[in-house]
Amino acid sequence: MSFDKIIGQEKVKKRLSFYLDGQHKTLLSPHLLFVAPRGSGKTLLAQTYASQLLNSEGKKRKLITINCSTLTSLKSFINDICIPYVSGKEITILFDEASEIPSAVRMALLTILNPNKENRNDFTYDDVTIEFDFKKVTFLFATTEAHKIFHALVDRLERIDLEEYSNDDLGMIVRKNTDALISDDAMEEVKKVLRGNARKATQMANHICLYLSSCNKQEFIMRDWVDFKNKLGINALGLTPMEIKILKILSEKSLTTLTNLSAKTQMSRQSLQRDTENYLQKLNLMEIAATGRKITAQGRQYLESLK
């Protein structure tokens, strides 16, 4: 089974290869839920898995990908997806952003995916009955927010949690996505600002290509990195200006409430919690206590390094 284009994720790839080997012999694949932070490559991994599922003739089965934010109703799910693509067909359906599945569709999926020894179910809607034969139909789901998916639906799926990318993995992703010659010392600095994110690594490769094209160069060395990061405003550890601003605000007091932080940054509480605090906590630059937020010793050292 081939996942050659996927860097890292060795345990996940072994597990998926096991499922593929079984599907090639029995035509049955478990319905899978891919879970990972944004930019980790979960959709690519799901699509790569789907591209290797076979139909009854031993040929690659067709895949359709649905962005669940566009699923408006159960009626559209049945009329626009199930009737034209599932009824009498062999298909794999990938639900991307699965946390956005509408409640009516979610409840229908509970019936459709109810496990049984026959590995098939019927679903009736407006006098139309659709057969879901799981030797012909496989459902895949991808999400960053598994906690928002109804637990009964999650229980019907095999959950695939992606591993965190190492810095070496990220460096390989950068090199894979550019023909430029990047020196080892420059790559060491590049890896430090990618925030553990595969998508950031791909974007970085594109930016390096643009930089070298503008300079009419083929090689990216340490001197280029210094110029490159200054032009793009890349901060140490890949922190954003807002994350640095938060550290500076936290450094002013021993404790800062989320409400006060929201007022000073003019960001909503939800946005602060979802978009900025996680990475700062991951790097141990800030802590969240019962009474508020505070900067750590490492956070203060980071601010000192900027002076």
Regions found by a protein language model. Give the residues of each.
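Conserved AAA+/SF3 P-loop NTPase catalytic/coupling segment centered on the Walker-B
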Residues: 74-78, 87-117, 146-155
